[in-house]
From Swiss-Prot:
Residues 344-599 form the Clu domain. GO terms for biological process: intracellular distribution of mitochondria; mitochondrion organization. Residues 1217-1242, 1254-1273 are annotated as: Disordered. TPR repeats lie at residues 981-1013, 1022-1055, 1151-1184. This is Clustered mitochondria protein homolog. One of its GO terms (cellular component) is cytoplasm. mRNA-binding protein involved in proper cytoplasmic distribution of mitochondria. GO terms for molecular function: mRNA binding. Residues 1262-1273 have a biased composition (Basic residues). Belongs to the CLU family. It comes from Vanderwaltozyma polyspora (strain ATCC 22028 / DSM 70294 / BCRC 21397 / CBS 2163 / NBRC 10782 / NRRL Y-8283 / UCD 57-17) (Kluyveromyces polysporus). It holds the Pfam family TPR_10. HAMAP family: CLU (MF_03013).
Length: 1273
């Protein structure tokens, strides 16, 4: 299609929608004209462009943010002929393919209680009451603040011409030098930031407190308060007069207004704080008609002179930020950091409890809503997007409600349905809650409660996979898991009818004659799978057909018989026909196969004392899929055909039911240990996978590869074995090189003697011919002709590599993750039976035992409430030695890996590495304050304070106190994401090499759909922006790549945290992109943030993590790019110091850096310092590479060349001095100029030419080489 044709089609598919505004809502017109983002005409109309398939709801959504209409909440859109339904599309309304214009108008509706509350809530959001750190569960945990928004970035530079690289030879030791086109101001700013980074290492001043300090309150309220009045509810007498609610408003200036809400709007009444009079207040200059405002904003602006200016100031403030830095999340929660900058200000605000719109709506039935949305037809893309958007919203709303309900249970505020039972269940707002435990003995012999905990995770994991399958006849339940204080609650929507009260029968006992009331059996019961009541496995052909076609097929399950009944999933799962006639499947934990080899080795055949805590050791779905794909690929079968023919299926009941086996399950179990685990180790060692920043990063990689966390110990052992093997190979290679060096030295001595002999013999021949008066033949005057076979040419053999920078941090991070997960289980053990108020005391006590023993050797549990005596609880008997032994025991049982007895002590100078890992795993938030792990630290802190403060300071009894920390819920949910978006993205990926523009369009559509479905604040959106930045970078569109990556960072900071691996990974990408975009200052700012975050935990020193090394390497390249050699030398020296601290000064990395520093000094004519550094390299290169290696030979040439050059300079200096003592002034001047000439010539040379000069031994030879190189270029 031609470009014109495309444009025409686009024009036809787009419709101009004009919305006429009612005259009564026009307010603060001057403000509108300044701020209006859309075209507001004098006729009070708004105009937009929409695709034809757009639904009316989308127009309503746009109007809810347009400046002229955003304060309107209760209206309908209409044409001349009809009031529009939100589900209608523009195409259905116009009903004319040729028409591309639609005129609409707004019809205001009378208010009722629900709409008044919605209006007030909306207004509060727009005038600053919706703080950027609040989400649906802010009452239980504190959300992350922002740091990224405060980085003082320069604007993204537009694309410039390609940078020409300075010519260079193949010497790998020479720094790469790309000259960056930047201003002197940026060079200075860059240098300042780099020195700041250097100082943080030199003086060890990377401070945890400042590194984790964040800003909050980007959004600030424009009123002091906006609440329901204490005079509510409306008295009966006034209710019949139309009064709906009473409001109380206090402005920032202290003005107080009491407001009456009526169907037509709002007006100021005559009430005061102690007097009730809801009648309209007379205000001078305002007529009665003007006193009632349909819009509450207009009413406040009318009566408060400064309110409007406060709103303008807020809007101006927010305009300086990206919206993603302050908007509220729609389908996810904000990150809950382990270290909170400060306690949030708890300003008096009744509305937090008053204005909950749910109180004014009918009780929700999440299951009915969810299933109805799933059944919506989606014939068009727009309808698919709408369906996914609704599914995502309701999933998150369910999770929010579930968390609130679960926390009520944890705090003892919800009554159980069966208060006398140990297995208590709860029901509120059509959400069913139950404690996760083995109450009915289902896991007897399999691990009991531990197995039940594992099964709940596996059940949820299966549901997370089902959400992406478009199943029509099989239904599943919304599910959320909430962990808090050692207990776990499973929240689900109940199967319709399953919990319904069917009434009761009165029966007479045959023996006693007593009458008893017995509940009638529910008509809704298990019809397929395990019926727990009868203990039988039931068959149902219709149910089985649906399950096998829509569920089992995609999960590679094999249909099989159990007790004569044919089923297509695990016999422990259940199929229930709900009262809504839908087929529900529940209890899906055992969908995936047992890790049979692990179970047999560590549970079935293990001693009881060494047995793994449970047998619910299933393989992950990622592993099954990885194994299945490997089988399909090996067989050369087409994917769809393999699905249709049910290739490589497995029986989920194998090794779960006695006598049932499956060779494919055995193969999967072997595949995990023998193929996947070693390949992951190899990927880490070779750098194919990034070194993990922390345990979460590591586990994310393991899960992607289908590896369970129970293999963390195995991973650490394999990594240690790999490292040890490399070290052994390295040592063996060094011995071989040592022998080879001796051999070479012997050959060299012999060869030199041979040449010497040849020279002597030839000279004797020449002398004889001369004496005889004969002509000397040409062959005796030419260079000696040597036998090429006798010459040993320099080698370029690769060194024996030891991947210390990859494997050592992998081992350390794995051990820390084992420790953190071990502590999670130990804390769960001691907290599960505690009242909530005693939990902080237990946690503080355990942390003091582990980390505060140097401050207080014998800490005591802190009392929290007189009703709860902490000394009576089990945890109070703990000792440090006992706790360390328990850690070793639990780590050995759960991870098959025993941590060293001094493991915690290894981090005594960097305890927050371990504290952070415990906090993130167990749901603990600490205040960001000074903590003292020794008495000396407290004394130093005391001395640093002002004298007035110093005298009032009282030393804390322990390192940690109850007031320092908070327990927060840990949540696992479905997290509904867009399948359509993923499909668009996959299409774009396939097209990228064929049609770049089409691919980028598909990527843009995919992200737009993701944002529509999940909202802009979501991990999936951030990940897509990060990937898109990489795509644009590879296509040379660097400015766009930088913009996308910045957006990814801003999102990740809010939903994952400032120190999360996702954030650090995004920052690393951003730093490189800023460098590629010739913005060294911006790049340095990002590297500073990375280094500051990581070094505040001392991970370079304690974990051997290469992130700081990588940062210095990139900063060095940038400093060369801005032609600041001295700064480059400083960076190289710091880089070298880090390498020495980690690996010593006898490594190839050290020698390479010394050589690089020497080159840099030589380039600025500082030959003395150049010689000092370069002279250290031959010995190391000789030892590591061999005497006859190219690099070793080159380093010797450097040393000899520099030595000769320095001697030559000294001789010339001496000659100049001698001449100066006997010559006149003019002669003296000429001599000095001659003496300085070589140095001046060298100053003009690049590092590359300098090497040629030193190797050649004369400036003439250097010039010839340089000319030759330029000619080749």
């Amino acid at each position: 299609m031609s470009e014109t044709g495309k444009n025409s089609t686009a024009e036809l598919s787009a419709v101009k929608v004009t919305v006429k505004l009612p005259e009564s809502i026009v307010h603060h017109r001057s403000h509108q004209k300044k701020q209006q983002s859309h075209n507001v005409k004098e006729t009070n109309e708004l105009s937009f462009q929409f695709p034809r398939e757009t639904r009316v709801q989308t127009i309503l959504d746009v109007l809810s943010y347009a400046q002229a209409t955003k304060y309107l909440t209760n209206f309908k859109l209409k044409t001349v002929h009809q009031i529009l339904n939100p589900e209608q599309s523009i195409n259905e309304i116009i009903n004319d393919e040729k028409s591309n214009h639609l005129n609409l108008s707004i019809e205001l509706c009378p208010y009722n209680t629900r709409e008044i509350v919605r209006h007030v809530l909306t207004l509060r959001d727009f005038i600053g009451f919706a703080l950027e750190t609040e989400d649906g569960i802010s009452e239980f945990s504190i959300s992350t603040g922002s740091k990224f928004s405060n980085i003082p970035f320069m604007d993204v530079k537009e694309k410039q011409e390609e940078i020409e690289e300075i010519p260079r030879d193949d010497n790998k030791n020479l720094p790469k030098k790309n000259v960056l086109k930047v201003s002197q101001e940026e060079k200075d700013n860059f240098s300042k930031e780099v020195h700041s980074i250097l100082d943080s290492f030199k003086y060890s001043n990377s401070n945890l407190k400042s590194a984790y300090s964040t800003i909050s309150n980007i959004v600030t309220p424009c009123l002091n308060s906006l609440n329901l009045s204490a005079f509510n509810p409306v008295p009966a007498f006034f209710k019949t007069k139309g009064h709906i609610l009473y409001l109380h408003i206090v402005t920032l200036e202290g003005e107080s207004f009491h407001v009456t809400a009526v169907p037509s709007g709002f007006y100021i009444n005559k009430s005061s704080s102690n007097k009730f009079d809801p009648s309209m207040k007379d205000v001078e200059g305002i007529t009665q008609q003007d006193s009632i405002k349909y819009n509450l904003y207009d009413l406040i602006a009318l009566h408060s002179k400064k309110f409007h200016s406060h709103v303008e100031a807020l809007e101006k403030k927010l305009a300086a930020y990206q919206s993603i830095e302050y908007v509220k999340p729609l389908t996810t929660f904000l990150h809950k950091p382990w270290l909170v900058s400060s306690l949030p200000a708890n300003n008096a605000d009744y509305s937090r409890m008053q204005l909950d719109s749910s109180q004014y709506e009918s009780e929700r039935n999440f299951n009915d809503e969810f299933q109805a949305i799933r059944e919506l037809p989606t014939p068009t893309v727009q309808e698919s997007i709408q369906s996914e958007r609704l599914l995502s919203r309701i999933s998150h709303e369910f999770t929010t409600a579930a968390v609130k309900g679960a926390m009520s249970i944890f705090y003892g505020e919800m009554l159980p349905l069966n208060p006398e039972s140990d297995d208590q269940i709860f029901l509120r707002d059509n959400i069913f809650y139950s404690y996760v435990m083995d109450a009915n003995g289902s896991y007897d012999g399999k691990g009991g409660n531990d197995a039940a905990f594992a099964a709940s995770n596996q059940d949820l994991k299966t549901i997370q996979i089902l959400k992406n399958l478009k199943m029509k006849d099989v239904y599943y339940l919304l599910t959320t898991i909430i962990d808090f204080g050692g207990k776990r609650i499973l929240a689900q929507t109940p199967v319709p009818g399953l919990l319904s009260n069917m009434g009761a029968d009165v029966i007479t006992d045959a023996d006693s004659g007593e009458q008893m009331i017995v509940d009638k059996k529910s008509e809704v019961s298990v019809v397929y799978g395990l019926d727990e009541e009868s203990g039988k496995v039931l068959a149902n052909d219709q149910f089985d057909k649906s399950v096998s076609e829509e569920f089992s097929k995609y999960l590679h399950l094999k249909s099989h018989d159990v007790e004569g009944s044919k089923i297509s999933f695990s016999y422990q799962s259940k199929g229930i026909l709900g009262s809504d006639k839908r087929n529900y499947i529940i209890d899906l934990a055992n969908t995936y196969p047992l890790d049979v080899k692990f179970a047999k080795e560590h549970f079935d055949n293990a001693e009881e004392s060494k047995r793994y805590p449970h047998r619910q050791t299933l393989l992950r779905p990622e592993l099954v899929e990885k194994w299945w794909n490997s089988k399909v690929q090996a067989e050369g079968i087409e994917i769809n055909k393999a699905y249709d023919e049910a290739k490589f299926t497995y029986n989920p009941d194998a090794y779960q039911v006695e006598g049932v086996e499956d060779v494919n399950i055995q193969d999967m179990s072997s595949y995990l240990v023998e193929t996947v685990l070693p390949s992951v180790i190899e990927d880490y060692a070779t750098g194919n996978v990034s070194v993990p920043y922390d345990g979460e990063h590591l586990v994310d990689t393991l899960h992607i590869n289908g590896i369970n966390v129970r293999y963390l110990g195995k991973l650490a052992i394999l990594a240690k074995e790999k490292l040890q093997l490399q070290e052994e190979v390295h040592e063996k290679r060094l011995k071989e090189i040592e022998i080879s060096n001796k051999d070479y030295e012997e050959w060299e001595a012999s060869y030199l003697k041979k040449i010497e002999k040849m020279i002597i013999e030839r000279q004797e021949k020449v002398n004889k011919l001369v004496q005889e008066g004969k002509e000397v033949p040409k062959e005796l005057t030419e260079e000696l002709k040597l036998n090429e076979d006798d010459i040993r040419k320099p080698t370029d053999d690769a060194p024996a590599v030891v991947n210390t920078d990859e494997l050592l941090p992998l081992i350390k991070v794995t051990e820390i993750e084992i420790f953190a997960r071990t502590m999670k289980h130990i804390l769960r053990k001691y907290t599960k039976d505690l009242p909530v108020v005693a939990i902080p005391s237990m946690i503080a006590f355990v942390l003091n035992l582990l980390f505060g023993q140097k401050y207080n050797e014998v800490p005591k549990p802190e009392s929290v409430d007189s009703f709860y005596d902490v000394d009576t609880y089990e945890f109070s008997k703990l000792t440090r030695d006992g706790l360390i032994k328990e850690i070793q025991l639990v780590s050995e049982l759960r991870f098959r890996y025993e941590l060293a007895a001094d493991f915690v002590d290894q981090f005594s100078d960097a305890p927050f590495i371990l504290i952070r890992s415990i906090a993130r795993k167990s749901g603990i938030q600490f205040l960001n304050k000074d903590y003292f792990f020794t008495k000396d630290q407290f004394e130093e802190f005391k001395l640093s304070q002002d004298k007035k403060v110093r005298g009032k300071l009282v030393a804390p009894a322990n390192t940690f106190t109850v007031s320092d920390l908070n327990m927060i819920p840990r949540i696992k949910d479905i997290d509904y994401s867009s399948v359509l978006s993923d499909q668009k993205w996959a299409e774009g990926s396939m097209l990228l090499n064929e049609d770049q523009n089409a691919a980028l369009t598909l990527f843009a559509q995919a992200i737009a759909i993701k944002e529509e479905v999940n909202g802009v604040l979501h991990k999936d959106v951030a990940e897509k922006y990060l990937t898109l930045s990489t795509v644009y970078s590879k296509l040379g569109l660097t400015p766009e790549a930088v913009a996308f990556c910045r957006k990814s960072c801003a999102i990740y900071e809010r939903v994952s945290g400032i120190d999360s691996f996702e954030m650090l990974r995004s920052l690393s990408n951003l730093a490189l992109l800023e460098f590629a975009n010739e913005s060294p200052y911006n790049s340095a700012l990002v590297f500073k943030r990375i280094v500051e975050t990581l070094e505040s935990l001392k991970i370079t020193e304690k974990i051997h993590h290469p992130a700081a090394l990588n940062a210095f390497n990139q900063l060095e390249q940038m400093s060369l790019g801005v032609e600041n050699t001295k700064l480059t030398v400083e960076l190289c020296k710091q880089f070298r110091s880090l390498i020495v601290s980690l690996d010593g000064n006898d490594t190839l990395a050290y020698a390479t850096l010394e050589s690089r520093i020497g080159n840099l000094y030589a380039s600025i004519n500082d030959f003395h310092n150049a010689m000092e550094h370069i002279s250290k390299t031959p010995r190391i290169f000789t030892r590591e590479l061999g005497t006859n290696h190219q690099i070793t030979a080159q380093s010797r040439q450097w040393v000899n060349g520099l030595s000769n050059l320095m001697k030559d300079a000294q001789q010339k200096k001496k000659l100049a001095a001698e001449q100066a003592s006997v010559n006149s002034g003019s002669r003296k001047k000429n001599v000095n100029q001659k003496a300085d000439a070589p140095k001046a010539e060298l100053a003009e040379k690049s590092v590359d030419e300098l090497l040629d000069f030193i190797e050649g031994g004369s400036t003439e030879k250097s010039k010839k080489k340089s000319s030759k190189k330029k000619g080749k270029k």
